[in-house]
Amino acid sequence: LAAKDNNVAGLLIAGEIEAGIVQLNELRQAIVKFKESKKPVIGWIENTSQREYYLTSVADKIYMHPASEVELKGLASYNMYYGEMLKLFGVGVQVTKVGKYKSAVEPFLGDKMSEPAREQTTQLLNGVWNRLLTDVSVSRQVTIASLRRAADDAGIYNAEKAKSLKLIDGIRQRDELITELRKIGAGADESGTSFRQISLAKYAHKVQLPRRGERIAIVYAEGEIVDGWGGVGEIGGDRLARDLRELRADPRLRAVVLRVNSPGGSAFASDIIAREVGLLRNKGIPVVVSMGDLAASGGY
């Protein structure tokens, strides 16, 4: 929508963001689509984390504050193990699990990661890291090998070094960034000291989508799956099943997008939800599942 909006001169990627790699990748894809409009996309770095840089790297130009740093250090997984400590207190743990890769309970059983858990974690991290490097390489027009060296050599870089590594395009103070943004068409704000801007959240709120006619429902399944109704941040099996049942009865419904971001949980609640999804499909209503950062166990 912003790509077609004549009131939008361009896009600025800046600030902190709390999101997983999957969500950031989806944002990157949306920005790549926005760039087809030929409107400029500018990235701004002030002490940026690796995840934030991954998103920012999609910009046409990236500017960095001279006193800030940027991370590019690779991925790692750290786990705590309590098995030996529990034994000291006379606490025994009995677990029933299916398959050698079901590692969620390992922290309560021993004092180190099992080889199957290490194998699957390593494979996951390598896959995500390779995707991240590939995306940054394409956006920044640098080799994957050079990005690997940057991550191995230090992992955190100041502005001058980041520029020499081609992680950024230029070094600017905040007032100089404002000047750059005005050059690409951003008008001055009411105070005359900054530029006219609107956040993504406020822009999405202002945009009016059609409310009549046929519908596609977007259902969010976010959090741990629990029996019953569930609370804030949980997927209650009964509650989500009821929502899906009500959608099935809506004559205007043409499809359902089920957004899953869950580590799993209750097998019973998961089965109740899966049954309602199946009934939607049996009625001829397409169900498209969009997986977020987590779609594990019952979530899958």
Q: Each predicted region: which residue ranges?
A:
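Small-residue-centered hinge/linker elements
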Residues: 1-152, 182-289, 293-300
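A ligand-binding cleft/hinge motif common to bilobed small-molecule-binding domains
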Residues: 175-183
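Short acidic-hydrophobic, aromatic-tinged amphipathic segments that line or gate anion-handling sites
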Residues: 63-64, 168-174
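Extended, domain-scale alpha-helical bundle/helix-rich regions
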Residues: 154-157
